[in-house]
Regions:
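Active-site helical microenvironments for divalent-metal-assisted chemistry
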Residues: 1-292, 296-348, 353-412, 424
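Exposed beta-strand and adjacent loop surfaces of beta-rich binding modules
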Residues: 421
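Conserved small/polar residues in nucleotide/adenosyl-binding loops
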Residues: 426-433
Length: 433
């Protein structure tokens, strides 16, 4: 079952020569709620959804008469936050807290009432999100940025799920940013680029991080974004045909080598293409690995076997092989990366990973907050998952001993917190129009 092209521009429509993400039209809350339940049932068929239903009914009535800038009923937003969390396959307490995340701040409902109805676990999550509240943001003030990050990390230390709810909240707000004033759009986009996207990156949640990046670029530099969309779409058909051919060739060779593999092709996301253009001072046509082919196999042994097959099929480009299986990234990411030259002289990248590695790459730390029921029915997070957050403990130690400037410097330096993006984001800011 080889899905050929995964298009990151899905949902983008060309309007007046520009690509725009179609907004979620005025939606019926009941239909949205049904979509949420369907998603939860998909990954946890036996769960009792009565708590989710109760949260929906309470939030629905608590937010009655409240509307967003789009004119939509306010309840649409918390429901989408719940859906984003369900897409990460999180536990129902997190989803319930996502649905209720604005009720204490924006309605007459109290934290005490949430505790009485849903228990202390949900109440603490809602309280954590409420306390983070509206972070005060200024792109030019290091002090403010450091203070925001301190708040975020302290919330994470108490319960990582608070940050997952906050990321889902920000993602839906970014998806509906077109209803804000232009200056507010730029401010939110920069804040997302400086704070939320790097945290999603550090937690390894690529499916949220890549969308936050693309939306940040769209609103902070619309001309650059739309120009890039048009340039990429101009040669879309020939690129898709090229990727299709690679996928078919690779699938055939994997079959012959008796390696069970799922092979997918995709065009890279706008922001990662733009980042390469800026950092390498190149045009779109000069970026040679615009597309990647992903091979998902059953075991680590198969990863290396698949690599051997690939290197026999195509010419590897020297210095472009990375073994993130033997040396995982700090955010737990594992894969083999190799860049190759096709028979027609077109370079492309292949990533090889197991299904478990793929889930960690997509969901990051959220992958370890799936339903883990022990015999007594209580969720448990294994000690090894705690170890994977040792970097967070390191941050908390620094928090106590450093001033804001030093704290930021440590985050961006020794800890490698924003390793992949820190320089790029600063560099990109210099290119803003």
């Amino acid at each position: 079952d080889n899905k050929v092209i995964e298009n990151p521009y899905k949902g983008l429509e060309i309007v007046d020569g520009h690509a725009v993400k179609a907004p979620e039209d005025y939606q019926d809350p009941k239909m949205l709620y049904e979509a949420l339940i369907k998603r939860i049932r998909k990954y946890h068929p036996s769960t009792d959804i009565s708590m989710v239903e109760k949260a929906f009914n309470i939030a629905y009535h608590a937010h009655e008469g409240q509307f967003r800038k789009s004119g939509e009923a306010y309840i649409i937003h918390p429901l989408w936050v719940g859906i984003i969390l369900a897409d990460l396959e999180l536990d129902k307490e997190t989803i319930v807290a996502g649905i209720l995340h604005d009720v204490v701040e924006d309605t007459v409902m109290t934290e005490q009432e949430i505790t009485e109805i849903f228990g202390s676990e949900v109440a603490l999550l809602v309280d954590g999100v409420t306390k983070l509240g509206q972070l005060s943001y200024s792109a030019d003030k290091l002090e403010v940025q450091a203070e925001n990050l301190r708040k975020m990390f302290l919330a994470m230390a108490k319960d990582i799920r608070v940050i997952l709810i906050k990321l889902a909240d920000r993602l839906h707000n970014m998806r509906t940013l077109q209803f804000m004033r232009p200056e507010k759009q730029i401010e939110k986009a920069r804040e997302t680029m400086d704070i939320y996207a790097p945290i999603a990156q550090r937690l390894g949640i690529s499916r949220i991080k890549t969308e936050l990046d693309d939306l940040s670029l769209k609103y902070s530099q619309p001309e650059v974004f739309y120009d890039l969309v048009q340039q990429i779409n101009a040669r879309k058909t020939e690129r898709e045909e090229f990727v299709q051919q690679i996928v078919e060739e690779v699938s055939e060779h994997m079959k012959n080598a008796k390696i069970k593999a799922e092979v997918k092709g995709r065009v890279k996301h706008f922001f990662s293409i733009y980042k390469k253009m800026v950092n390498q001072d190149k045009t779109v046509d000069q970026i040679y690995d615009l597309f990647a082919v992903r091979i998902i196999v059953e075991s680590v042994k198969d990863c290396y076997a698949a690599l051997g097959v690939i290197h026999e099929m195509y010419t590897p480009i020297p210095g472009r092989f990375k073994d993130y299986i033997a040396m995982p990234k700090p955010n737990m990411y594992q894969s083999l990366h190799t860049t190759l030259m096709s028979s027609v002289g077109q370079p492309f990248e292949i990533q090889i990973r197991t299904e478990e590695m793929h889930k960690t790459a997509e969901y990051g730390i959220a992958a370890h907050w799936k339903y883990k029921e022990s015999n007594d029915g209580k969720k448990s997070v294994a000690a090894q998952e705690e170890e994977k957050l040792s970097w967070l403990r390191q941050i908390l130690e620094w928090q106590q001993d450093t001033d804001n400037r030093e704290f930021l410097s440590l985050l961006k330096g020794d800890l490698d917190l924003f390793a992949e993006d820190a320089v790029s984001y600063t560099h990109l800011r210099a290119h803003e129009t």
